[in-house]
Amino acid sequence: MRLHLLEHDPDELSDTHLIQWAKQKGHAVGQTYLCKNEKPPALDEIDWLMVMGGSPSVWEEDKYPWLIPEKELIARALVHNKIILGICFGAQLLAQALGGTVSANCPKEIGWHDVNLTKAGRRSFLFRGIPDRFTTFHWHSNCFTVPQGCTRLAFSEAT
């Protein structure tokens, strides 16, 4: 499988464990920093799009103009039935593209917090080998509604 990561903060590196996992499984991995005006590959060159976290909010196109082509890319990937995984800010972008509502009125979670898998999350290959409840580092103050037709796989106290 050809995985491609969309990155949002030029000074942050994606979880090297994620990249190592993908490579160990025999997947090709690419990365694009849209915030550095890098161009992503054509959709026919990727199978799985991973939209990573970042500090912007989904409504800040004026401050981060690269959000406009990123949102267009996500919409095209959905139309072409690409596998898309959104993490943190990436999940907000994906939820918005699918008709969910992103808002800034949820409690901030900054620091180490528990994540709980839902029943669907426990069955998902994405969480194979992961405990039903685990602790990970959070840094977010925005949240989103799960769009119609989508399935929540995990949640924290604030989400």
PLM features: residue spans?
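Short loop/helix-cap segments at secondary-structure boundaries that form the rim of catalytic
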Residues: 39-44, 93-95, 145-149
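Cysteine-nucleophile active-site neighborhood
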Residues: 52-124
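Phosphate-binding glycine-rich loops and adjacent basic patches that engage nucleotide phosphates
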Residues: 29-40, 87, 108, 149-157
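Pocket-forming structural segment of enzyme catalytic cores
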Residues: 98-159
